[in-house]
Amino acid sequence: MSLMNDPRPVSKKAGAKPVYGKNTPQFTKTVGEIVNALINAYKEGKKVNLLKIKTELAAKNSLSDQPKSVDIISAIPESYKNTLLPLLKAKPVRTASGIAVVAVMCKPHRCPHLAMTGNICVYCPGGPDSDFEYSTQSYTGYEPTSMRAIRARYNPFLQTRHRIDQLKRLGHNVEKVEFIIMGGTFMSLPSDYRDYFIRNLHDALSGHTSNNVAEAVKYSEQSNVKCVGITIETRPDHCLKLHLSNMLTYGCTRLEIGVQSVFEDIARDTNRGHTVRAVLESFQLAKDSGFKVVAHMMPDLPNMGMERDIYGFMEFFENPAFRADGLKIYPTLVIRGTGLYELWKTGTYKNYSPDSLVDLIAKVLALVPPWTRIYRIQRDIPMPLVTSGVEYGNLRELCLARMKDFGTKCRDVRTREVGIQEVHHKIKPDQVELIRRDYVANGGWETFLSFEDPKQDILIGLLRLRKCSETSFRPELKENCSIVRELHVYGSVVGIHNRDPTKFQHQGYGTLLMEEAERIAREEHGSIKLAVIAGVGTRHYYRKLGYELDGVYVSKYLG
């Protein structure tokens, strides 16, 4: 029995004061005293130093270790939970963007282009044939999401339930959930497995046992825990019309597409199994279907070099044929068992130095337009598994610090989000204005509407509006139509039926953005209909604004 779970007092030396672990009366007493101290501080309007309270009371009651936030949260009376949870919330950045992200993994399977090219990408770890054989393609099995998936034996229902319960115990509001389906190319799996997987994700939220995806979506729409979106990782060659239509029926609203490089020779040399031209076609098809598009890019690939890397990112941000809505930057890692590892061993390939990599990404972040969101700046592969490559676990932080040295600033969506600003810098917006930015991307006219505090450069909410192009293949979007691809109000999560004047959700920003989008669609686009790609759990919200279910979208005819 471990010290923490042993109810008996334990002392290392004879005559020493006894030390108590978990499951002892002393531990329970300490947790109760901490909760009482928090309640009293709240009643008296005092600021709380939680660490000091825990340290003092744990020492006073001779505990072997301080109580964790989970222990304290479980002891808070229901009447005080709304006021005290923000003080105890572990990792507040998890829900700072207004939603609780639940990452799940599909079962391990071989890469779809293996049959065509005879091999996987040179840098790719993981998969059934790799040194990490129980992992999914491009993962090692030691990432936090991978380990949760392996513990659940890749069961989607259990993965969802376990992660939601974990977030609840950490003090997060989980009424608005966004799924990210990871683990290789999900759309290359058999359709019956995909249906089983999606059905179980929705059933894990609603508690209903469904017979098919349509039934699961119907019950998920009425669930107390709302599925506000699903993100699917895919490749350009598995992002064609049939794939897109299937993903729309699943309730998918965002795609993560592996691009890795904007150069055809690099795509060929790294054995990607698709062309850059295929990337551009998939981007246009996806946006014309209403999806938000997030690209994966890899600096430091073989045969690139610093200047070519920077030029590649300039091309990505400035060329209208690319211009994704979001970006994940994954610097190249050398991992045992990959083709790149063999090149590294022979000296044919060498990574940038750690300082050079920080310089490169700092320069890239300065190029990011204000309508693009940088979701990640490095893989969460544990450092002991990395033979060569990124040597820091806090790469984003180091890059932002280097930008200060350069006198530049990152103005991407995530850096400016009100929730992130509040968590990291304790800054709140003062004067909020509606700001509009128009640009051309992927054969269409894009309008990026946002509520911002321009002086402090803080973003409260955004809307992405697109005039559907003539090449749109979805029947719902064939007539003269515009589509809202994203509506998001940031800040920490507020419950579906709750109001909190100190938060930014449910304060009317979303309605105002939709009204402006309707005006632009009617008066400037000349559209007769406005469609929205709405997450399954958000359809009720749009019904209140006069929208009705229209195939896989919700839409409204503009008078």
Swiss-Prot record:
GO cellular component entries: cytoplasm; elongator holoenzyme complex; nucleus
Domain N-acetyltransferase: 408-559
Enzyme Commission number, as recorded: 2.3.1.311
Required cofactor names: [4Fe-4S] cluster
UniProt enzyme class: transferase
Top-rank taxon, per record: Eukaryota
Catalytic reaction(s) noted: uridine(34) in tRNA + acetyl-CoA + S-adenosyl-L-methionine + H2O = 5-(carboxymethyl)uridine(34) in tRNA + 5'-deoxyadenosine + L-methionine + CoA + 2 H(+)
Keyword Transferase: yes
Record-listed [4Fe-4S] cluster binding positions: C111, C121, C124
Cross-referenced CDD domains: Radical_SAM (cd01335)
Family matches, as Pfam families: Acetyltransf_1 (PF00583), ELP3_N (PF23613), Radical_SAM (PF04055), Radical_SAM_C (PF16199)
Annotated Radical SAM core domain residues: 94-384
GO biological process, one term: tRNA wobble uridine modification
UniProt pathway annotation: tRNA modification; 5-methoxycarbonylmethyl-2-thiouridine-tRNA biosynthesis
Gene3D superfamilies: 3.40.630.30
PROSITE patterns for this protein: GNAT, RADICAL_SAM
Positions that bind acetyl-CoA: K176, E486, L487, H488, V489, Y509, G510, T511, Y542
Cofactor note text: Binds 1 [4Fe-4S] cluster. The cluster is coordinated with 3 cysteines and an exchangeable S-adenosyl-L-methionine.
Assembly: Component of the elongator complex.
Job of this protein: Catalytic tRNA acetyltransferase subunit of the elongator complex which is required for multiple tRNA modifications, including mcm5U (5-methoxycarbonylmethyl uridine), mcm5s2U (5-methoxycarbonylmethyl-2-thiouridine), and ncm5U (5-carbamoylmethyl uridine). In the elongator complex, acts as a tRNA uridine(34) acetyltransferase by mediating formation of carboxymethyluridine in the wobble base at position 34 in tRNAs.
NCBIfam families: ELP3 (TIGR01211)
Protein name: Elongator complex protein 3
Protein's organism: Dictyostelium discoideum
